[in-house]
C-alpha cells in the first residue's frame, strides 16, 4: 500500500524524517502552497516569494532523485487553500494507506495535523524533527525542577551533546562563553565586502510575479530579490560566510552601521530555518574554520552559541510554554504599534534605518531587532502581541517557534522572566555607543530634556519609573534604579512629562 508524505515549506531537507523509508515507486511526496499559510498574517512579500521559490526548487530536487512529487501552486485553480484541504484532495486522488509527516514547528499547524486521522480515517504518522538537537521531551526533562531556565546552562548541555568546541568534557579555550569579547562598537572600518546575492532564475521570477499579483498590499518590496532558493546556492552562502565574514563576526556582532546593515552577520538563518541548510552542519563548518586557523575562538563560539544555544533554547521554550504564551503581558502594555513601524517614516534615525531596511530586505540582524525596534516597543509600552505579530510578518526567517519566544520573552519581557533575567531596555547612550545612527539624527543622544533630546532617553527612565513595583527586586536593575533615586524630584518629573508628551503623539 502507498503512503502520502506531506512536506511543509520549512522542511525542505532531503534528510527530513518524513522521507525515511519512502518507496519511490509507489509513495507520493506532497508539497503545497496554500493561502491559509500565506495569509494568516500579512507576511513580507519577499518572505512569501522566498519560501514558495525554495519549495518549487526543492520539488525539482526531489524529482531529480526519483521521487514522485505532487505539487500544488498557490494560484492553481483547484487549490483547496489549506493543508487539510490539499491532503484531502490527494487522498481522494491517490487513496494512500497512511499519511506521513514530520512534526510542524508551530502550535497552529500541529493542531491541524492532529485532526488528520479523525478527518480522513487513515493512519497518520507524525515524526519527530531530528534537525533539532533537543526533542520536546528532552527539553522538558532539562527544564524540570529548575528554578530558572538559564540559556547558558542549556547551551553547555548542547556543547557536550554535540562535542562542538570540546576537549573531552572541557570547553576548548577553557571557557564556555566568550561574549565579553564580542561587544565592539561601530567604527567606519567595519565596512565589509558585500554578501553574495543570487539572481532570480525562471522559477523565482514566476513566483515574484505571482506574489505581486496575489499579495499587492502586503508589507515590503520584491525588488532586488537575492535570496538563495536552492541547496547549492545556500551552501555557497555558507562558504562565503566562513571564508569572508566569520573571522570578524564575534567582536562586531553587536555593532550597527548605516552604510552596511549586514556587517559580518551570516545571513544564513533563512536557509537553516527552512531546511536548505542543516544547523549542525553549519556549526561544524564554523568549528573547522577555527581548527584550521581561519577564525578566532571568540567568533566561532559566539556563532555556534547563536545556533545550538539560542535557537535550540527558543524552540524548547516555545513548546514548553504552550499556546497561551502569546498572551503573556507582564507589564500590561496596551499601546498600538505606531504607524512608522510599517513605513519607516520617523525622525528617529535608528528606527527609520532599521525599518526601511526591513521593508527592502525582509531582514535585520539580531541587535537591530532587539535593541532598536524591540527596545523602542518595550519602552513605549506597545502591546506585546502586536509586536510579536509585526516581527512574524516582516522577517523572512521568522517562524513562530523561534520568533515568539524571542519577542515575548527576550525583547518585550512580557513573560515576566520565564525566559530572560532582565528587560533589554536601553537609552540613547547605548545606541550611540554601538552604532553610527546618531551621527545624522535630528535628536541628540546626550540630551535628556531639551528640544533635541533623544526620545529613547526619557522613555527609558519613564519605563523604569512606571514599572518600578514589578522590577525593583531584579538585582540586575539595581544600578539604574539607584541612578534614578539620585535624580532630583524636578528632573524625574520632567523626564516623565517629556516621555508622556512624546507618547501622546504616538496615540
From Swiss-Prot:
Its recorded reaction(s) are: (6-4) photoproduct (in DNA) = 2 pyrimidine residues (in DNA)
Please tell me where 6,7-dimethyl-8-(1-D-ribityl)lumazine binds in this chain. Answer: 9-10, 32-40, 105
Leader sequence range is none
InterPro entries attached here? Crypto/Photolyase_FAD-like_sf, PhrB-like, Rossmann-like_a/b/a_fold, UV-DNA_repair_photolyase
Protein family per UniProt: Belongs to the iron-sulfur bacterial cryptochrome/photolyase (FeS-BCP) family.
Question: Gene3D superfamilies recorded for this chain?
Answer: 1.25.40.80, Deoxyribodipyrimidine photolyase-related, DNA Cyclobutane Dipyrimidine Photolyase, subunit A, domain 3, HUPs
What GO biological process terms are annotated to this protein in UniProt?
A: photoreactive repair
Give the EC number: 4.1.99.13
Which SUPFAM superfamilies does the record match to this protein? Cryptochrome/photolyase FAD-binding domain
Report the co-factor binding details: Binds 1 FAD per subunit. Binds 6,7-dimethyl-8-ribityllumazine (DMRL) as antenna chromophore.
Instruction: Please explain the role this protein plays, according to its UniProt record.
Output: Photolyase involved in the repair of UV-induced (6-4) lesions in DNA. Catalyzes the photoreactivation of (6-4) pyrimidine-pyrimidone photoproducts by using blue-light energy. Can repair (6-4) photoproducts in ssDNA as well as in dsDNA.
Q: Name one Pfam family in it.
A: DPRP
Query: Null-mutant phenotype, please?
Result: Cells lacking this gene show a strongly attenuated photoreactivation after treatment with UV-B irradiation.
From the broadest rank down, the organism's phylogenetic lineage runs: Bacteria, Pseudomonadati, Pseudomonadota, Alphaproteobacteria, Hyphomicrobiales
For binding [4Fe-4S] cluster, which residues are annotated in this chain's numbering? 350, 438, 441, 454
**Methyltransferase as a keyword?**
no
EC class (word): lyase
Sorted alphabetically, the keyword list is:
4Fe-4S, Chromophore, DNA damage, DNA repair, DNA-binding, FAD, Flavoprotein, Iron, Iron-sulfur, Lyase, Metal-binding, Nucleotide-binding
What name appears for this protein in its UniProt entry? (6-4) photolyase
Q: Which species expresses this protein natively? A: Agrobacterium fabrum (strain C58 / ATCC 33970)
Amino acid at each position: 500500500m502507498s503512503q502520502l508524505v506531506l512536506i511543509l515549506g520549512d522542511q525542505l531537507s532531503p534528510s527530513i524524517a518524513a522521507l525515511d523509508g519512502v518507496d519511490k515507486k509507489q509513495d507520493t511526496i506532497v508539497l503545497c502552497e496554500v493561502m491559509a499559510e500565506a495569509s494568516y498574517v500579512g507576511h513580507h512579500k519577499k518572505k512569501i516569494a522566498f519560501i514558495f521559490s525554495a519549495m518549487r526548487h526543492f520539488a525539482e530536487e526531489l524529482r531529480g532523485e526519483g521521487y514522485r512529487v505532487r505539487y500544488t501552486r498557490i494560484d492553481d485553480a483547484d487549490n483547496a487553500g489549506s493543508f487539510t484541504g490539499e491532503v484531502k484532495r490527494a487522498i481522494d486522488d491517490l487513496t494512500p494507506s497512511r499519511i506521513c509527516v514530520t512534526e510542524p514547528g508551530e502550535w497552529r499547524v500541529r493542531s491541524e495535523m492532529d485532526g488528520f486521522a479523525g478527518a480522513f480515517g487513515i493512519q497518520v504518522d507524525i515524526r519527530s524533527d531530528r534537525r533539532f538537537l533537543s526533542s520536546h521531551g528532552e527539553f522538558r526533562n532539562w527544564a524540570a525542577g529548575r528554578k530558572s531556565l538559564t540559556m547558558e546552562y542549556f547551551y553547555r548541555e548542547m556543547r557536550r551533546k554535540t562535542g562542538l568546541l570540546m576537549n573531552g568534557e572541557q570547553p576548548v579555550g577553557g571557557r564556555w562563553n566568550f561574549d565579553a569579547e564580542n561587544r565592539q562598537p561601530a567604527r567606519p572600518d567595519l565596512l565589509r565586502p558585500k554578501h553574495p546575492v543570487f539572481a532570480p532564475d525562471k522559477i523565482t521570477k514566476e513566483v515574484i510575479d505571482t506574489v505581486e499579483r496575489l499579495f499587492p498590499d502586503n508589507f515590503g518590496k520584491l525588488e532586488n530579490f537575492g535570496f538563495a532558493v536552492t541547496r547549492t546556492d545556500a551552501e555557497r552562502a555558507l562558504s562565503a560566510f566562513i571564508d569572508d565574514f566569520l573571522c570578524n563576526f564575534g567582536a562586531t556582532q553587536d555593532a550597527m552601521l548605516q552604510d552596511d546593515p549586514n556587517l559580518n552577520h551570516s545571513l544564513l538563518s533563512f536557509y537553516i530555518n527552512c531546511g536548505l541548510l542543516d544547523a549542525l552542519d553549519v556549526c561544524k563548518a564554523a568549528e573547522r574554520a577555527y581548527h584550521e586557523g581561519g577564525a578566532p575562538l571568540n567568533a566561532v563560539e559566539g556563532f555556534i552559541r547563536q545556533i545550538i544555544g539560542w535557537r535550540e533554547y527558543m524552540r524548547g521554550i516555545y513548546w514548553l510554554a504552550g499556546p497561551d504564551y502569546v498572551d503573556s503581558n507582564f507589564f500590561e502594555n496596551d499601546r498600538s504599534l505606531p504607524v512608522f513601524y510599517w513605513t519607516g517614516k520617523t525622525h528617529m534615525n535608528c528606527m527609520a534605518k532599521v525599518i526601511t531596511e526591513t521593508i527592502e530586505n525582509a531582514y535585520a540582524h539580531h541587535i537591530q531587532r532587539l535593541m532598536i525596534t524591540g527596545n523602542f516597543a518595550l519602552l513605549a509600552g506597545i502591546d506585546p502581541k502586536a509586536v510579536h505579530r509585526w516581527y512574524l510578518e516582516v522577517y523572512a526567517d521568522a517562524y513562530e517557534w523561534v520568533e515568539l519566544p524571542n519577542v515575548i520573552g527576550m525583547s518585550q519581557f512580557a513573560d515576566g522572566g520565564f525566559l530572560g533575567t532582565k528587560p533589554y531596555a536601553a537609552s540613547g547612550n547605548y545606541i550611540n555607543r554601538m552604532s553610527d545612527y546618531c551621527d545624522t539624527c535630528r535628536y541628540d543622544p546626550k540630551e535628556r530634556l531639551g528640544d533635541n533630546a533623544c526620545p529613547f532617553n526619557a522613555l527609558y527612565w519613564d519605563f523604569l519609573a512606571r514599572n518600578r513595583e514589578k522590577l525593583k527586586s531584579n538585582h540586575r536593575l539595581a544600578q539604574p534604579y539607584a541612578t534614578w533615586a539620585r535624580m532630583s524630584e524636578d528632573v524625574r518629573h520632567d523626564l516623565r512629562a517629556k516621555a508622556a508628551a512624546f507618547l501622546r503623539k504616538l496615540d
